[in-house]
Swiss-Prot record:
Name of this chain's protein: Chitinase domain-containing protein 1
Pfam families per the UniProt record, alphabetical: Glyco_hydro_18 (PF00704)
Keyword terms, alphabetized: Lysosome, Secreted, Signal
Domain (GH18): residue spans on this chain: 79-393
SUPFAM superfamilies in the cross-refs: (Trans)glycosidases
InterPro entries, alphabetized: Chitinase_II/V-like_cat (IPR011583), Chitinase_insertion_sf (IPR029070), Glyco_hydro18_cat (IPR001223), Glycoside_hydrolase_SF (IPR017853)
Lineage: Eukaryota, Metazoa, Chordata, Craniata, Vertebrata
One Gene Ontology CC term in the entry: extracellular region
Bilayer-crossing regions: none
């Protein structure tokens, strides 16, 4: 506990670092962990009494790969559930196939759209598209929609200005997206663009996204928009996407993937997603609950490992987390205020560390909150967590 207090004290002297869905360059390296075999169980984690604040390291080590095979198609979340999959984490592809029926939407992080010149657009990343995997998903769950993430990659400020000032540019941009979806047999797209302008040009972005949404809907395609948190992490300040923009876009957006994670950073160590902050981010966007079912509350399946030396930290995935539990046998501590577990351990020469990583209990609390608020869930990302997490969905 002393270490955690030290980390949080150090954090207050550092500036805010904003979060984006694609803030995963550091997570890419961490994702390349050795895969472990899953095990099957006749009972769910709920029935085994594992969803608890009083969780033991040894129980996680023993049970984390054991999910209930009998209830793979049984859903506990009534609203939409979106799961992200990344090309650099092969286990996520397997998780998506195994638990496909628990997801209404699966988004593979494959694509970029680039502006090649005047009224000329190209969708790249198509070499990553795995049609066999898509076929397997649809075979397992006919109702699950495949909606790849598409990122506005390599765009200059002038590129955005050119599009904002021309309806023809917008039409060509939207047309390239629609044609790609038809060619590749996608069900729609998750669009990530809002954070790239740092909160500037909001009304121009709204205008662009309304046109994209109308074009996708005309082709009977889903439109999911990634949005940053309504309250800037680590502050009481409003974020770069607020209620005004939400109300303008809600009629043409099918779902909003809300980034309620990455609350802390190596420069500002602490919890991944304090529960009160998560709740505030939803309520500020839609205080009257008019469009709540369109909000997908962001849920992280990765954690952070912070060092007391030099205010450093790195992402931590399931395999590494279990290794720490095995090696150090730490006590897991539950913080009721943030609704997260954390642990502390000491490396031989690396000093003291604090780890915030999701547990069955922290996930269940957020699923309960989503149910209470009337929202869905968006998980970043499949394969980073522990296999028994999916019993909860």
């Amino acid at each position: 506990m002393r270490l955690l207090s030290t980390l949080l004290l150090v954090a207050t002297t550092y500036p805010l670092i904003s979060a984006t869905l694609s803030k995963t360059d550091s997570k890419k390296a961490a994702s390349k962990a050795p895969e472990t075999k899953t095990r099957l169980s006749d009972t769910s984690v709920q029935s085994r009494g594992l969803v608890s604040t009083d969780v033991k390291a040894k129980d996680i080590v023993l049970e984390h790969r054991s999910y209930c095979a009998k209830k793979l198609k049984e859903r506990h979340v009534s609203a939409d559930v979106l799961g992200y999959v990344t090309p650099w984490n092969g286990h996520g592809y397997d998780i998506a196939k195994t638990f496909a029926a628990k997801f209404t939407l699966i988004s593979s992080v494959w694509l970029q759209i680039r502006r090649k010149g005047r009224e000329a657009y190209q969708v790249t990343g198509l070499h990553d598209v795995d049609q066999g995997w898509i076929k397997d998903i649809r075979k397992t769950s006919k109702s699950t929609q495949i909606v790849p993430r598409i990122l506005f990659d390599g765009w200059s400020y002038q590129d955005f200005e050119s599009v904002f000032n021309s309806e023809d540019e917008i039409e060509e941009l939207a047309g390239a997206m629609v044609q790609t979806a038809k060619d590749e047999h996608f069900d729609g797209f998750v669009v990530e663009v809002w954070s790239q302008l740092g909160g500037q040009k909001r009304q121009e972005l709204v205008h662009l996204l309304i046109h994209i949404g109308e074009a996708l809907h005309s082709a009977k395609l889903h439109f999911i928009l990634v949005i940053p948190p309504a309250v800037a992490p680590g502050t009481d300040q409003l974020g770069m996407f607020g209620r005004k923009e939400f109300d303008q876009l809600a009629p043409v957006v099918d779902s909003f993937s809300l980034m309620t994670y990455d609350y802390s950073s190596p420069q500002r160590p602490g919890p991944n997603s304090p529960i009160s902050w998560v709740q505030a981010c939803v309520q500020l966007l839609d205080p009257e609950s008019k469009w709540r079912k369109k909000i997908l509350l962001g849920l992280h399946f990765y954690g952070m490992d912070y060092s007391a030396l030099g205010a450093t930290g790195e992402p931590i995935l399931g395999n590494r987390y279990v290794e720490i539990l095995k090696e150090h046998k730490p006590k897991l501590l539950w913080d009721q205020q943030i609704a997260e577990h954390y642990l502390e351990y000491k490396k031989n020469k690396g000093g003291k560390h604090a780890v915030f990583y999701p547990t069955l209990k922290s996930i269940q609390v957020r699923l309960d909150l989503a149910e209470e608020l009337g929202t869905g869930i968006a998980i970043w990302e499949l394969g980073q967590g522990l296999d028994y997490f999916y019993d909860l969905l």
